Amino acid sequence: NFMQHIMTVMSSHGRAGVVLPDNVLFEAGSAGEGIRRRLLEQFDFHTLLRLPTGIFYKPGVKANVLFFEKRPPRADGKPNTKALWIYDFRTNLHFTLKKNPLDTKDLQDFVACYQVGLLGQRRETERFKRFEIDELLKRDKLNLDIFWLKDESLDDVDSLPTPDFIAAEIVENLQAALEAFQAVADELAVKP
């Protein structure tokens, strides 16, 4: 699979940031659990960014960015990951491709929390939490689909979008997808 390939071809001390669907974090079976275990033990899997829905053409896609570095095995045999920092950029945030697109400014808090080059100086915030390796390894099937923020939209039925708003969002997503596909079709038509 894609993730296994990346992990295999990375050079020692190489770094990666990989966008993957949610199921990689909790997929049952030996393959899914094995990938997560290898990621935690052989790599310094230091950061997980939970992406909001509405930023991809396919509506409802739940994805994450995994940030990790390949390390040589530790002399003490312990995992290379000491702690995983998770930034929840999904709960109570909503983006669309046209009316409310994701912008660079929306990621400023994550960038500030990430502390490029200064991982040891990170501080927890409401959206950014640290999970120790011992805690992660005890989780059933190494499930890394971790969340702590309460989704307010699930409690407040009155705050749910109206049917016409939902319909308008569907139309917007379909139009954006159609435009993207039309651009591909136009490009293919030009080539001999």
What role is predicted for each listed range?
Residues 1-192:
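A conserved structural/catalytic subdomain of Rossmann-like adenosyl-cofactor enzymes
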